[in-house]
C-alpha cells in the first residue's frame, strides 16, 4: 500500500489517499483455492470492501465529505481492465459509471498501483499496461469531444418526454433512460 502511495502524484491528495487505501480490503476478501496442487490467492470484490473500510476511516480522520466521497469513488472503481476490444458504447458505460471528471485520477491511481506492484515509476508510455491506459485516455477524450451523453441530464430526452410518448410512469421510464444512456 505504501509503495502505491509513493507512486501517486504528489500534488493530488485524493489520488494519494486512494492509493493508500485501495487494497485495504484484501485481507477480508482473501480466498485460497487450489489448482493443480498449487494454492492460488484471490481477492474478489476487494475494491468494494476497501471502499467500505475507507469511508469511516477518512471520516474519523476529519477529512472533508467531498474528499471522502471522491477517494471512496476512486477506491471502489480502481479495478477496471480496459481492453482494446471495448466498443465505443463500453467506453461510454465506463465513463457513466466513473464520471468524466474522475478518469484522469483513476488512470493516476492505476499507474500508482502498478508502481506499488513493481516498484518502478510508471508513465503512460512505459509498459503495455501504461500504453493501454493511454489508449483508453485517448478514447475517453474522443467520446467526450463527440458530446456523448454521459449523464441522464445530458440525454436529449427525459422522463417526461418518455411518458408523453406513452411509456407508463414508474421503473420502466428509468430503465429506458438508462438504456439510452448506455447505447
Feature annotation, model-predicted:
Residues 2-128:
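Divalent metal-dependent catalytic cores for phosphoryl transfer on phosphate-bearing substrates
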Residues 1-2, 136:
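Short, motif-level signal for alpha-helix interfacial/capping segments enriched in acidic residues
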Residues 54-60, 117-183:
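Charged substrate- and nucleic-acid-binding regions of tRNA-handling and nucleotidyl-transfer enzymes
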Amino acid at each position: 500500500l505504501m509503495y502505491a502511495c509513493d507512486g501517486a502524484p504528489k500534488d493530488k491528495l485524493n489520488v494519494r489517499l486512494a492509493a493508500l487505501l485501495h487494497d485495504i480490503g484484501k485481507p477480508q476478501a482473501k480466498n485460497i483455492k487450489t489448482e493443480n496442487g498449487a494454492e492460488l490467492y484471490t481477492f474478489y470484490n476487494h475494491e468494494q470492501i476497501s471502499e467500505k473500510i475507507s469511508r469511516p476511516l477518512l471520516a474519523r480522520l476529519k477529512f472533508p465529505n467531498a474528499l471522502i466521497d471522491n477517494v471512496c469513488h476512486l477506491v471502489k472503481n480502481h479495478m477496471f481492465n480496459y481492453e482494446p476490444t471495448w466498443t465505443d458504447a463500453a467506453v461510454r458505460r465506463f465513463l457513466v459509471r466513473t464520471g468524466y471528471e474522475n478518469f484522469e485520477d483513476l488512470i493516476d491511481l492505476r499507474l500508482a498501483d502498478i508502481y506499488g506492484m513493481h516498484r518502478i515509476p510508471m508513465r503512460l508510455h512505459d509498459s503495455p499496461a501504461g500504453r493501454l491506459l493511454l489508449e483508453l485516455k485517448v478514447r475517453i477524450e474522443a467520446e467526450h469531444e463527440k458530446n456523448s451523453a454521459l449523464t441522464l441530464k445530458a440525454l436529449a430526452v427525459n422522463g417526461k418526454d418518455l411518458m408523453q410518448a406513452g411509456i407508463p410512469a414508474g421503473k420502466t421510464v428509468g430503465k429506458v433512460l438508462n438504456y439510452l444512456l448506455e447505447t
